[in-house]
Amino acid sequence: MVGIVNYNIGNLASVLNALVKVGAKAQIEKEPSRLLEYDRLILPGVGAFGDAMEHLVQSGMKEAVLEFAKSGKPLLGICLGMQLLFEKSYEFGEHAGLGLLEGEIIPFDKTRMGEGYKIPQMGWNRFYAKKKSPLLKGLEEGFYLYYVHSFHAVAKREEDVLGESVYGYPFVSAIERDNVAGFQPHPEKSHDVGLRILKNFCEIG
């Protein structure tokens, strides 16, 4: 069973619908005490980093998600959910994250991007795998995923980087370390390729 963390922010219904499409048993969970009952967990999210962390703390989900990660079961962050896995973000100030991955979240650097690039990045972009992973099983190199974001991750450990994309310059588009992984793009909005990623996640372990 896949648990989708409900902390009053995020694209919960679209993630649930995508999981149902790939044949997974899944449900939205708002009770922190129940997270460990699930085989795997998805942390979705849209909006501002600081607000999201505040919701996680107030709902009691922060400690529950950290406990789940320690259990060794698969945990997947999507979009803002991926960003929350890192140590901190510089979105509208400086905010501490969950600290499950080493690195930080920064805004796209307009001085490096050149002309013609709008922020947020919104639309399809190519994904370049940086290492092998069960999450990418059955996918050919250079596939496209759907992105909506103004900030991106900078990982301290190169070996944690699962994939990169280019928007003016290369940035981390997916991360994976042990049982914790994240995608900056939205698999649930990325048609067959995105559904394959979610299916792969459901088959890990």
Swiss-Prot record:
Q: Name one GO biological process term.
A: L-histidine biosynthetic process
Active-site feature positions: C79, H186, E188
Q: Which SUPFAM superfamilies match?
A: Class I glutamine amidotransferase-like
Instruction: List where the protein spans the membrane.
Output: none
Q: Which GO terms describe its cellular component?
A: cytoplasm
The molecular function GO annotations come to: glutaminase activity; imidazoleglycerol-phosphate synthase activity; lyase activity
Q: What is its EC number?
A: 4.3.2.10, 3.5.1.2
Q: InterPro entries attached here?
A: Class_I_gatase-like, GATASE, Imidazole-glycPsynth_HisH
Please list the reactions this protein catalyses: 5-[(5-phospho-1-deoxy-D-ribulos-1-ylimino)methylamino]-1-(5-phospho-beta-D-ribosyl)imidazole-4-carboxamide + L-glutamine = D-erythro-1-(imidazol-4-yl)glycerol 3-phosphate + 5-amino-1-(5-phospho-beta-D-ribosyl)imidazole-4-carboxamide + L-glutamate + H(+); L-glutamine + H2O = L-glutamate + NH4(+)
* Top-rank lineage group of the source organism: Bacteria
Q: Which UniProt keywords apply?
A: Amino-acid biosynthesis, Cytoplasm, Glutamine amidotransferase, Histidine biosynthesis, Hydrolase, Lyase
Q: Which Pfam families match?
A: GATase (PF00117)
Q: Does the keyword Glycoprotein apply?
A: no
Q: What is its main location?
A: cytoplasm
Which subcellular locations apply to this protein? Cytoplasm
Pathway listed for it is: Amino-acid biosynthesis; L-histidine biosynthesis; L-histidine from 5-phospho-alpha-D-ribose 1-diphosphate: step 5/9
Assembly:
Heterodimer of HisH and HisF.
NCBIfam families with a match to the protein in the record: IMP_synth_hisH (TIGR01855)
Stated role: IGPS catalyzes the conversion of PRFAR and glutamine to IGP, AICAR and glutamate. The HisH subunit catalyzes the hydrolysis of glutamine to glutamate and ammonia as part of the synthesis of IGP and AICAR. The resulting ammonia molecule is channeled to the active site of HisF.
**What is the recorded name of this protein?**
Imidazole glycerol phosphate synthase subunit HisH
Please name the gene that encodes this protein. Answer: hisH
